[in-house]
């Protein structure tokens, strides 16, 4: 059976992700007490159901300590995937304000006896981060701070489509001017490379457009940067595998996240496609989420 566990911070999109999995044919349960999960999996398997999705959050705080061991045990018999959704505190506060929803931990006792009850939304968010932090290392993290609901649904579907027999590597392009991604395991700064933004014809385009690809592909320094990052990844990916890592997010950042980082993320993904399961996300580029074109896969080094 394939089991998808959705966890993370309240307000980061767990309900959206669970709905996407339900549309994909998964049997979905929200806020299931973790200790019930093995029994539910056995029951559904006997009933002929082979796909289960469960959302787990801080409302199950009494059982969260059991989750690491439970995930390991379930993985012995099932294809278990963990999706950890995160977002910046500012984004979460804005979402709770707009929806007028109450945070699950608002009004709950603080772990600090001198504080009493958690009175502010920010306190509740930070307390939840502490509670669910141990689960982050088991899952593929997605920073939803800037994601629209339809984009998140698409990424969840891509996540479950990936083969689970090897390390999954996500290449994520981003712009430093919009902040660094919360879900990055490795981060590379490519702002030292020539910027297509200063060419007025290239400015409105992205690193997925052929004129920008041609501009960057003609520069030896760009290929030197790509070669160095590729060599680093090829050296260290075996060590991530030995550490039993299932997911690795490699963030590539330029100033605006539109040209250089997009091109390099796509090029690196094409190079590593034979060595790992790869997916590409362009956080800040104005591109269709389904337009992760493989134009750069056909680029040949000079």
Swiss-Prot record:
Q: Please name the taxonomic classification of the source.
A: Bacteria, Pseudomonadati, Pseudomonadota, Betaproteobacteria, Burkholderiales
Its function?
Answer: Displays ATPase and GTPase activities.
Where along the chain is ATP bound?
A: 8-15
Entry binding sites for GTP:
57-60
Pfam families membership? PapZ_C (PF22740), RapZ-like_N (PF03668)
Record-given protein name? Nucleotide-binding protein Bcep1808_2900
| Highest taxon of the lineage | Bacteria
According to the UniProt entry, its GO molecular function terms are: ATP binding; GTP binding
Q: Which organism is the protein's source?
A: Burkholderia vietnamiensis (strain G4 / LMG 22486) (Burkholderia cepacia (strain R1808))
Which UniProt key words apply to this protein? ATP-binding, GTP-binding, Nucleotide-binding
**Residues passing through the membrane, by range:** none
Give the matching InterPro entries: P-loop_NTPase, RapZ-like, RapZ-like_N, RapZ_C
| The family this protein is said to belong to | Belongs to the RapZ-like family.
């Amino acid at each position: 059976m394939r089991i998808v566990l959705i966890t993370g911070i309240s307000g980061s999109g767990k309900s959206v992700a669970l709905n996407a999995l339900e549309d994909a044919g998964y049997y979905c349960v929200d806020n299931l007490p973790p200790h019930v999960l093995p029994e539910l999996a056995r029951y559904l398997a006997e009933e002929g159901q082979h796909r289960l999705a469960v959302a787990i959050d801080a409302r199950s705080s009494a059982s969260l300590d059991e989750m690491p061991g439970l995930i390991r045990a379930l993985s012995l018999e099932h294809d278990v995937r963990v999706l950890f959704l995160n977002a910046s505190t500012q984004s979460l506060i804005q979402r709770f304000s707009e929806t007028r929803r109450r945070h699950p931990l608002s009004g709950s006792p603080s772990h600090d006896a001198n504080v009493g009850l958690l009175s502010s939304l920010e306190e509740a968010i930070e307390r939840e981060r502490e509670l669910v932090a141990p689960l982050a290392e088991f899952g593929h993290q997605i920073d939803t701070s800037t994601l629209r609901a339809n984009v998140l649904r698409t990424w969840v579907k891509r996540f479950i489509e990936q083969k689970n027999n090897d390390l999954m590597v996500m290449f994520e392009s981003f712009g430093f001017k919009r902040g660094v991604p919360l879900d990055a395991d490795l981060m590379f700064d490519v702002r030292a490379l020539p910027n297509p933004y200063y060419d007025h014809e290239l400015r409105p385009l992205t690193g997925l457009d052929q004129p920008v690809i041609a501009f960057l592909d003609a520069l030896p320094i760009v290929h030197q940067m790509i070669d160095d990052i590729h060599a680093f990844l090829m050296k260290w990916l075996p060590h991530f595998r030995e550490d039993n890592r299932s997911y690795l997010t490699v963030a590539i950042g330029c100033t605006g996240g539109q040209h250089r980082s997009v091109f390099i993320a796509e090029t690196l993904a094409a190079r590593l496609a034979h060595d790992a399961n790869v997916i590409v996300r362009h956080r800040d580029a104005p591109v269709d989420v389904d337009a992760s074109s493989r134009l750069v896969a056909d680029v040949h080094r000079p």
